[in-house]
């Protein structure tokens, strides 16, 4: 693939990447970014700061967590399709369309909202949050951005004859199957993967950043080969970008802007993983201080360096690339910008 698109500095030394917060002509704050870029041969070809730094994969692991359900045949047995698969892989915005799919998934299993182990939170999408407020309602577990993943995990337990209670807990067969899948794609032995509790209650995996990039590079390669399970996941995400994120959600906009040539997966605390299909690449970043506001400019900056973005970002995606900072009068007083050395 065209490695000439990779900055020479990445193959020679660590590429120091920051996202700076400006105010006027000055820099007010600085977010340090760690990154790893892996190619189709599993080679680490680009780094920013400490590519081996260990952190939690958070929601970036979702495409791998749903793989055991697909492999078991349970997904097809219940008759689900691309909408359900996109939602199971998503950090969705909690809009009515997302809630309806999650509710339908539970209904197909003979289950209800109370069977979900995730707690409720306000929809991540401003549209979704506004709809809940205007209805005078409270968010439910279905609005949780991980409700699709949880429904898929319940399906895995249901069709395997495992107990549904505690499906989210470390040691449950559902979580052990996910651990095995993560280990297989990252090449990190199960015993060396840190296990903790994610924001939604399921097991979360801690591993090196370059291992995360390796897994997403392998997804890109597997899709190019036509491997069934990765291809089905990629097809669901790229043909259902709204389900995968929502109105103006970053992951959805990246899929749309690149016509499905790139899959971007957001995670909490400034972690992000990306597969670039045409280049057979995967990369992962971690904003050191966990600031979400810094991860989007960093991801878009790296996609630009790799030549993976078309010329001329859509206005909505451009807002993520250089987020404007406004004061209480609505005046633009600064912005977030990627800066490298």
Spans of model-derived segments:
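Active-site SXXK
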Residues: 57-75
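A short glycine/serine-rich beta->alpha loop
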Residues: 48-56, 88-92, 135-144, 196-203, ...
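Residue-level preference for non-acidic, small/hydrophobic
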Residues: 62-66, 212, 280
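Active-site-adjacent helix/loop patches that line small-molecule binding or acyl-intermediate pockets
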Residues: 5-12, 81-192
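Short glycine-rich loop/turn motifs
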Residues: 30-35, 151, 179, 269-272
């Amino acid at each position: 693939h065209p490695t000439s698109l990779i900055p020479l500095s990445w193959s020679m030394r660590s590429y120091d990447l920051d996202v700076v917060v400006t105010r006027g002509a000055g820099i007010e704050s600085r977010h340090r970014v760690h990154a790893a870029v892996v190619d189709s041969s599993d080679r680490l070809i680009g780094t920013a700061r400490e590519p081996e730094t260990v952190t939690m994969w958070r929601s970036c692991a979702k495409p791998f967590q749903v793989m055991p359900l697909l492999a078991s045949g349970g997904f097809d047995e219940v008759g689900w399709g691309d909408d359900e698969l996109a939602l199971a892989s998503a950090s969705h915005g909690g809009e009515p369309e997302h809630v309806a799919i999650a509710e339908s998934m539970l209904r197909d299993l003979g289950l209800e909202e109370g069977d979900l182990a995730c707690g409720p939170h306000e929809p991540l999408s401003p549209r979704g949050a506004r709809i809940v407020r205007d209805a005078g309602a409270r968010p439910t577990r279905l609005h949780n951005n991980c409700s699709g993943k949880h429904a898929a995990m319940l399906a895995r337990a249901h069709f395997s004859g495992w107990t549904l209670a505690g499906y989210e807990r470390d040691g449950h067969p559902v979580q052990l199957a996910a651990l095995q899948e993560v280990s297989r794609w990252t090449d990190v032995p199960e015993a060396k993967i840190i296990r903790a509790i994610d924001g939604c209650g399921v097991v979360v995996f801690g591993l090196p950043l370059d291992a995360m990039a390796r897994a997403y590079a392998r997804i890109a390669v597997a899709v190019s080969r036509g491997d069934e399970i990765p291809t089905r996941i990629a097809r669901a995400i790229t043909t259902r970008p709204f389900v995968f994120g929502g109105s103006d959600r970053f992951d959805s906009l990246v899929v749309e802007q690149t016509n499905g040539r790139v899959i971007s997966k957001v995670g909490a605390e400034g972690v992000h993983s990306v597969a670039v299909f045409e280049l057979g690449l995967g990369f992962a970043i971690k904003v050191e201080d966990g600031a979400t506001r810094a991860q989007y400019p960093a991801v878009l900056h790296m996609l630009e360096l790799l030549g993976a973005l078309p010329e001329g970002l859509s206005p909505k995606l451009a807002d993520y690339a250089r987020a404007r900072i406004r004061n209480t009068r609505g005046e633009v007083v600064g912005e977030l910008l990627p800066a490298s050395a």
